[in-house]
Amino acid sequence: MAEFSLDKSHIAGVVLAGGRSQRMGRDKAGVMLGAESLLRHALTRLSQQALHVAVNADAAAEDVPVVPDRFPGKAGPMAGIHAAMVYAADLPSITHVVTVSVDCPFFPADLVARLAAAIEHPSQIAIAASEGRSHPVFGLWPVTLAADLEAWIATDEKRRVRDFLLRHDVTEVAFPLHPTRASLLDPFFNINTPDDLVEAERWLEALRA
């Protein structure tokens, strides 16, 4: 049997930016980190790793396609992942879609390459991990799972990402901490509160040093 191989030419990317941002008190996609919004940080990183890039949000964002939830207000990040799958399935040559969260501006520059390298067959899912914790929102998903995910969202009341993963073959990819001038940074550090934003500014400066 030929070894399965997946590269950038078959991968689309979607930034999940449809959350309510209650602890931040405002839409996180538009929050400024340095001179750019969190959404722009995510798009810049993702566009270097995927053939097509879009944003899962409720309204127009930046200069990329917007992919709204088909289950608004009901399924949390799973609705965004489903929307990403549906969007990617309509693109020529695309077999997989990678999802990232808008509130994690430092996610790895080799996220997609390492997730893709870990996949052993077309229907397998790859998710990221660091520091012993999985980050299922950062996942590489076969677009063929869209119908199954849609049915699962419609019937499962909890709709947690981890519960859906239990239905499928999943591989987890551990990413190392990133060295900076200050200390080691978890690349999946996320910004949920104003205090987190202050910390992110410090990390941004440390990375630039």
Curated annotation (Swiss-Prot):
Record: residues binding Mg(2+): 103
CDD domains: MobA
Molecular functions (GO terms): GTP binding; metal ion binding; molybdenum cofactor guanylyltransferase activity
Main localization, broad class: cytoplasm
InterPro entries: MobA-like_NTP_Trfase, Molybde_CF_guanTrfase, Nucleotide-diphossugar_trans
Subunit structure of this chain's protein: Monomer.
The encoding gene: mobA
Protein name: Molybdenum cofactor guanylyltransferase
Xref: Gene3D superfamilies: Spore Coat Polysaccharide Biosynthesis Protein SpsA, Chain A
Lineage: Bacteria, Pseudomonadati, Pseudomonadota, Alphaproteobacteria, Hyphomicrobiales
Organism: Rhizobium johnstonii (strain DSM 114642 / LMG 32736 / 3841)
Comment, domains: The N-terminal domain determines nucleotide recognition and specific binding, while the C-terminal domain determines the specific binding to the target protein.
